[in-house]
């Protein structure tokens, strides 16, 4: 994938009900690698997969998406194989799976480790003791995140 594909990648996310926008896809291009299937649709890519390595010890496979009209044609399997090969030598490769993708991942050797849920809350009022983050806070935030996540991801965090 190249930068000119960003709008069609964002369209793929939207079409399959995910929430990534072009800025999110830019992170994958900058910090990792993205492979897509372009079937000529001028508005939307057919399929995608991305990898985000965090050094040699940890990597995440992301954005394994297939447009509805192109499903059950082996695209997800092909893209997942590319991602796994791209990350060869990485100690731990992980991903999070939707119910639709779980079968594909299981066939390639991935197994369940934990679940997740997406939560949202309305904006809350700021109360005493809470302040915006300052530049001086970064070292402590990065140390805490690295300890909790298991790898450094400064570039990703600074994007938010």
Task: Tell me the role of every PLM-derived stretch.
Residues 59, 80, 86-99:
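Conserved GNAT acetyl-CoA-binding A-motif
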Residues 3-6, 11-23, 144-155:
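Helix-loop element at the rim of GNAT/NAT acetyltransferase active sites that forms part
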Residues 63-66, 72-85, 103-107:
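Conserved acetyl-CoA-binding loop-helix of GNAT-fold acetyltransferases
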Residues 36, 43-53, 57-65:
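Conserved beta-strand in the GNAT
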Residues 110-160:
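Amide-forming acyltransferase catalytic core, primarily the GNAT-like/NAT-type
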Residues 25-31, 159-160:
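Short loop/turn motifs at secondary-structure junctions and domain boundaries
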């Amino acid at each position: 994938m190249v930068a000119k594909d960003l709008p069609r990648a964002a369209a793929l996310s939207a079409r399959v009900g995910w929430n990534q926008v072009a800025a999110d896809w830019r992170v994958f291009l900058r910090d990792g690698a993205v492979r897509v299937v372009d079937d000529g649709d001028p508005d939307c890519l057919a399929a995608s997969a991305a990898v985000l390595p965090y050094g040699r010890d940890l990597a995440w496979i992301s954005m394994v998406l297939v447009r509805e009209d192109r499903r059950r044609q082996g695209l997800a399997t092909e893209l997942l194989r590319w991602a796994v090969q791209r990350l060869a030598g990485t100690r731990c490769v992980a991903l999070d799976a939707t119910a639709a993708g779980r079968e594909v991942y299981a066939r390639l050797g991935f197994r369940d480790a934990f679940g997740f849920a997406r939560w949202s809350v309305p904006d809350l009022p700021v109360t005493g003791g809470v302040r915006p983050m300052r530049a001086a806070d970064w070292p402590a935030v990065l140390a805490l995140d690295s300890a909790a996540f298991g790898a450094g991801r400064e570039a990703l965090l600074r994007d938010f």
